[in-house]
Amino acid sequence: MTRHNNDLDWMLRAPELLALTRHMSTHELMSRMTVYNGFDYKKTHRLGVYFEQLWQHLTSQCNSLNIISHNLQVIIDKHTFGEFDSLIYDSVLDTHLHCELAVKFYLQVGSGTQLSHWVGPNLRDRFDNKHERLFEHQLALSKNPTIKPWLKAQDIKVDQVKVLTRGRLFYPLDSFMKEQFRFPREVNPQHLKGFWTTWEDFAHLQLSSSIEWYILPKMYWLSPVTGDEVQDLSLLDDRAILIHGHNERYEFQRIQQVVGMREGKEIMRGFVVTDEWLEKAKARVKSSD
């Protein structure tokens, strides 16, 4: 299978990131979907856009679903109110659906029990802010009194809203190794997990294990890496990190997602962060208090 097919399969089978009610979940919907060849990949460097492409392909191949619109912007009197990720008619349930999509990756910097203790790798994104926007704004678009007449004028119905959440939470290395996971009640207990650590501690992890480590480009952040794919990835040399760890020319002077491989199989993945990133992340979490 190609990476795209693996990612399509991952989208279908990976656990939800959030704990969703049956009413909100897309699980029943996706149980009718199948991975077919012919994915029309439009090159992008934005993982969220790629995630939308995967969803659009899966829904287009499902006979019981009719696509009304994807990425429909709501513009009223030159003001943009938001965007509907996916509007679909489900012929099995005779229901018009508004589906929102979210693929997110957060690192635990606080104690972990609050959404605000989790920050994105770029530091601009924080879990509590995303959660609030998703449920208070994006999923509520069709209920907005200003937008209701606009939808009617477009002859668009919304009977039910659903959300598809995928992604991974990254725990401090020690917690990850001991399987001591503390996460918010809004999170699905079966969510995908990874670790994070500093470059200095990561160098010691490399030396103490037989795992080969590779840098993961963003387009490899979804499905597990296969043995055939490692030839396309950059191998992290433990000696180079120890010798050149303070040289700004090297990859490891910024945050990177890495994957550990053994005998052609993915063992674990995580983020390796700089000291500067960690200080900024702590300040980002503290600002929520």
Predicted regions and their residues:
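Intrinsically disordered, low-complexity Ser/Thr/Pro/Gly-rich regulatory segments
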Residues: M1-D289
